[in-house]
């Protein structure tokens, strides 16, 4: 959709998944470092399954939104009267959602005992991100300078994310790569929203001059600010997860110490009773 909603929708999806990853991966990493932690990986496998279902569901919502909005193509690619293309921008967004939907289906299949190759879920996600980047690279040709530039900045986050995911295919459960991917996903989410605000101002806000070079300079600086905020969010979430994991780790120690004290007092009472009976 060539409007604000068409950018807010994918932005929301990327933001949700980026924020979720910024919590899930530190939680798994820090729990794995807890000595004597006997938790099974089944819990995290279920989370992967839920994540795959949500990814497929969000993709389906995106496809339906792009195709069946009032001014959408309604599954028509070619106009039957003059044989012209019908709403190719909507079709490009639909294609992007399609590949993310495939990634979600692969995540779901990975959960079941089908003996799928290890890393196939990451590979399918990496392909989806590459397709997204390819589509957006040819998305704004012959458009005003600011429009082209703001979309080209998005490609930095997209292809950076793709490279990270492709490395994850061979380096599974690497916390640095996972956090890097999460930060770039948050960046994609917030930047989609920024694109919407710049190209389609809301509430009667003044329109941006698409040919002013100062606007191009500001947008570049603004992109860096967005990533700084994404890194700040990552740091806050990691700190909160670290605090919660450490607090939970200390609870068994406190309980064990309490039981030791109770048992020692019980032993003292029994000893005193035995001593009293011996004297009698």
Swiss-Prot record:
<dbReference type="InterPro" id="IPR006904">
    <property type="entry name" value="DUF716"/>
</dbReference>
<comment type="similarity">
    <text>Belongs to the TMEM45 family.</text>
</comment>
<feature type="transmembrane region" description="Helical">
    <location>
        <begin position="49"/>
        <end position="69"/>
    </location>
</feature>
<feature type="transmembrane region" description="Helical">
    <location>
        <begin position="184"/>
        <end position="204"/>
    </location>
</feature>
<keyword id="KW-0472">Membrane</keyword>
<feature type="transmembrane region" description="Helical">
    <location>
        <begin position="150"/>
        <end position="170"/>
    </location>
</feature>
<dbReference type="Pfam" id="PF04819">
    <property type="entry name" value="DUF716"/>
</dbReference>
<feature type="transmembrane region" description="Helical">
    <location>
        <begin position="7"/>
        <end position="27"/>
    </location>
</feature>
<protein>
    <recommendedName>
        <fullName>Transmembrane protein 45B</fullName>
    </recommendedName>
</protein>
<keyword id="KW-0812">Transmembrane</keyword>
<dbReference type="GO" id="GO:0016020">
    <property type="term" value="C:membrane"/>
</dbReference>
<feature type="transmembrane region" description="Helical">
    <location>
        <begin position="120"/>
        <end position="140"/>
    </location>
</feature>
<dbReference type="InterPro" id="IPR042127">
    <property type="entry name" value="TMEM45"/>
</dbReference>
<keyword id="KW-1133">Transmembrane helix</keyword>
<feature type="transmembrane region" description="Helical">
    <location>
        <begin position="96"/>
        <end position="116"/>
    </location>
</feature>
<feature type="transmembrane region" description="Helical">
    <location>
        <begin position="216"/>
        <end position="236"/>
    </location>
</feature>
